[in-house]
């Protein structure tokens, strides 16, 4: 089974928070994990923000980054091609998604994902509308 992770779910693999158990289970059960190229800079930014906000103590920052890098190495990366970009534009218009969420949805469809794991209500709704199974990592 191909499971697509958006950044909100991927970060739950690195930082223990509500939804982490669900995200870890989805990762473990997947035959293949896919994500778009944008996930990496988004995840790095998310780690930095967690550090600034005090959700990630400074003493764990290095280990968290190493965990992120190790997980990223196991991801089948979906590149943002012209086709994916255009599909993302369509998804943004059709489903009222923000730009990056639309890219994640288009990338999941492009990867022929069986399920999308995320913690964003609008993206979960749009994925269901596109016929994808979803794993709700909000809690």
Map each language-model feature to its residues.
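Alpha-helix capping/helix-boundary segments
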Residues: 9-10, 39, 84, 104, ...
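Anionic, Ser/Thr-rich low-complexity intrinsically disordered regions
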Residues: 25, 58-60, 67-70, 80, ...
């Amino acid at each position: 089974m191909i499971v697509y992770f958006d950044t909100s779910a991927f970060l739950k693999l690195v930082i223990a928070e509500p939804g982490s158990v669900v995200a870890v289970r989805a990762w473990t059960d997947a035959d293949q994990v896919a994500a778009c190229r944008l996930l990496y800079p988004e995840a790095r930014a998310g780690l930095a923000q967690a550090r600034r906000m005090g959700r990630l103590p400074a003493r764990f920052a290095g280990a968290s980054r190493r965990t992120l890098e190790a997980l990223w190495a196991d991801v089948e990366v979906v590149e943002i091609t012209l086709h994916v970009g255009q599909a993302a534009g369509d998804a943004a218009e059709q489903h009222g998604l923000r730009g990056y969420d639309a890219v994640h949805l288009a990338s999941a469809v492009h990867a022929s994902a069986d399920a999308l794991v995320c913690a964003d209500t609008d993206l979960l709704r749009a994925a269901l509308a596109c016929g994808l199974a979803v794993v709700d990592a909000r809690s």
